[in-house]
UniProtKB/Swiss-Prot annotation:
HAMAP family: Ribosomal_uS11 (MF_01310). This is Small ribosomal subunit protein uS11. Pfam families: Ribosomal_S11. GO terms for molecular function: rRNA binding; structural constituent of ribosome. GO terms for biological process: translation. Gene3D superfamilies: Ribosomal protein S11 (3.30.420.80). Part of the 30S ribosomal subunit. Interacts with proteins S7 and S18. Binds to IF-3. It comes from Moorella thermoacetica (strain ATCC 39073 / JCM 9320). InterPro entries: Ribosomal_uS11, Ribosomal_uS11_bac-type, Ribosomal_uS11_CS, Ribosomal_uS11_sf.
Amino acid sequence: MPPRKTARPRRRDRKHIESGIAHIKSTFNNTLVTITDKNGNAISWASAGTVGFKGSRKSTPFAAQMAAEAAAKQAMEHGLREVECYVKGPGAGREAAIRSLQAAGLEVSVIKDVTPIPHNGCRPPKRRRV
């Protein structure tokens, strides 16, 4: 009887990507940072909630900074060096997230605002009276 080959678990090869796109979605309640390759395949992502902020603290610029830092560190393990920033939404963490990506060691080549603006589409929610 021939010796049986033991099934060895396959090691997943890390994708080595030089440049990518950082999608920053900043809402009034949270900030999401997704870093993708040029084709749009996600390499890493983080949000203010996944970094450990809860409730109203998620909407702060500091939370956005921490989320961007976490996503950048994860992406730099794949060899990422340069990103284009696509910023969407009206939130407080827009600039903080971009600055944090630069501080983490990523070179930001382009900053583009891709906030969707309606040509008078849906009716917006009513104004708050506090």
